From Swiss-Prot:
EC number of the protein: 2.3.2.35
Protein's name according to its UniProt entry: Acyltransferase Pun1
Keyword Protein transport: no
Gene name of the encoded protein: PUN1
Reactions accelerated catalytically: vanillylamine + (6E)-8-methylnon-6-enoyl-CoA = capsaicin + CoA + H(+); (6E)-8-methylnon-6-enoyl-CoA + 4-hydroxy-3-methoxy-benzenemethanol = capsiate + CoA
Active site: H169, D384
Family: Belongs to the plant acyltransferase family.
Regions crossing the membrane: none
Enzyme class: transferase
Organism: Capsicum frutescens (Cayenne pepper)
Keywords: Acyltransferase, Transferase
Domain of life: Eukaryota
GO biological process: alkaloid biosynthetic process
Length: 440
């Protein structure tokens, strides 16, 4: 289709605020943010789920009633879920505290005047997909007092729906988001019963207290959305297996993971597309729930992360076997560290504060710093509200640059990568022949 501006395709049918179905106890009124929480800007983690077969379509004359019914079902289950996820129904009091005042989460009901396939099959899908996210909201700096959770349900002319969630990064990471989505979708599926009660564990500042380093002022996102673009790349199972076999043979690394080979390839190609190739650094984020002693459960809610990194100072460093070998070495080192006392993410934040710059900004003097968030094995494609698995899960386009997000592809053992780069760099990156060899 000739893609129209979102304003010409989208009509908002309803906007409301969903409060927890029961009041939050006064003993839980204030949620303390950890040092890592405070180091993050007031941005959202935006994601959307596309469900092409929701239910048998009603007659066109009743189409608006169908949207109302779906919205009511989701609102009711969200209200029940927020009882357990009470900080997301509150407001930021300051950069150290969430006031869990039960003000509620914002909920939008939207009609989109096209079919879902026109969005999913669009040649610029990463841009087109953003139509199901609240306008101007994803990755935005939601100032103190803003909503910490915003949900939008969008109904297409074909009868399919998309459910998008903008989830405050101040309170939780990608694993926290998945916990919330699994709990909310489970409550929605089982809406005829009242036995299911989600049981997230909010960690707050119990692991990474601010007592050692002091409180932080909220950092701001400085990148310009108009200068940053996102591309969706699919690494099919067969091509990914070939890449892993090639790297294993040339590097000596036993069973290189999907994330290792894909992130190394993206780093190599992005660096090559940059106007200033070297020196460069690749920073991987780590979920440390199972690395902390005692281990934290998977339902722990918070920003429970660390980092490890590799560097490239010459052309030999940029060869795939070398990159993967170095990634394997550094992740093994990370697993041997005390991720509370020797947390590299905290050390980077503290060092950045000392130098008066943002984290990862010219890190250790490296002009090109790329970050990678690996969500492979996080089962986003199993989030089922009662209409089966989603056809696609997408991440909102944002003002980040030099960022890679990896997650499972919907079928097999493939990987879907979302790559965010500067416009000019992206135009060179997407023509890289080595990259094109391994993507669909």
């Amino acid at each position: 289709m000739a893609f129209a501006l979102p304003s010409s395709l989208v009509s908002i049918c309803d906007k409301s605020f969903i409060k927890p179905s029961s009041l939050t106890p006064s003993t839980l009124r204030f949620h303390k943010l950890s040092f890592i929480d405070q180091s993050l800007s007031n941005m959202y983690i935006p994601c959307a789920f596309f469900y092409p077969k929701v239910q048998q379509r009603l007659e066109d004359s009743k189409n608006s009633d169908e949207l109302s019914h779906i919205a009511h079902l989701l609102q009711t289950s969200l209200s029940q879920t927020l009882v357990s996820y009470y900080p997301y129904a509150g407001k930021l009091k300051d950069n150290a505290t969430v006031d869990c005042n039960d003000m509620g989460a914002e909920f939008l009901s939207v009609r989109i005047k096209c079919s879902m396939s026109e969005i999913l099959d669009h040649p610029h899908a990463s841009l087109a997909e953003s139509i199901v996210l609240p306008k101007d909201l994803p990755w935005a700096n939601n100032c103190e007092g803003g909503n910490l959770l915003v949900v939008q349900v969008s109904k297409f002319d074909c009868g399919g729906i998309a459910i998008s969630v903008c989830f405050s990064h101040k309170i939780g990471d990608g694993c926290s988001l998945l916990n919330f989505l699994n709990d909310w979708s489970s409550v929605t599926r089982d809406h005829t019963t009242t036995t299911l009660v989600p049981s997230p564990r909010f960690v707050g500042d119990s692991v990474f207290s601010t007592k050692k380093y002091g409180s932080l002022i909220t950092p701001q996102i400085l990148s310009d959305l108009n200068e940053c673009v996102q591309k969706r790349l699919i690494f099919p199972t067969d091509k990914l297996d070939a890449l892993r076999a090639k790297v294993a043979e040339e590097s000596g690394v036993k069973n290189p993971t999907r994330a290792e080979v894909v992130s190394a390839l993206l780093f190599k190609c992005a660096t090559k597309a940059s106007s200033s190739m070297l020196p460069s650094k690749l920073v991987h984020f780590l979920n440390i729930r199972t690395m902390i002693k005692p281990r934290l459960p998977r339902n722990a809610i918070g920003n429970l992360s660390s980092i490890f990194s590799i560097e490239a100072t010459n052309m030999q460093d940029m060869e795939l076997p070398t990159l993967v070998r170095n990634l394997r070495k550094e992740v093994e080192v990370a697993y041997k560290k005390d991720q509370v006392e020797q947390n590299e993410l905290i050390l980077e934040v503290v060092e950045s504060m000392r130098e008066g710059k943002l984290p990862f900004e010219n890190m250790d003097g490296y002009e090109n710093v790329y970050t990678c968030s690996n969500l492979c094995k996080y089962p986003y494609y199993t989030v089922d509200f009662g209409w089966g698995r989603p056809e696609r899960v997408c991440l909102g386009n944002g003002p980040s640059k030099n960022a890679f997000f990896l997650k499972d592809y919907k079928a097999g053992q493939g990987v879907e990568a979302r790559v965010m780069l500067h416009k000019q760099q992206m135009s060179e990156f997407e023509r890289n022949e080595e990259l094109l060899e391994f993507i669909a």
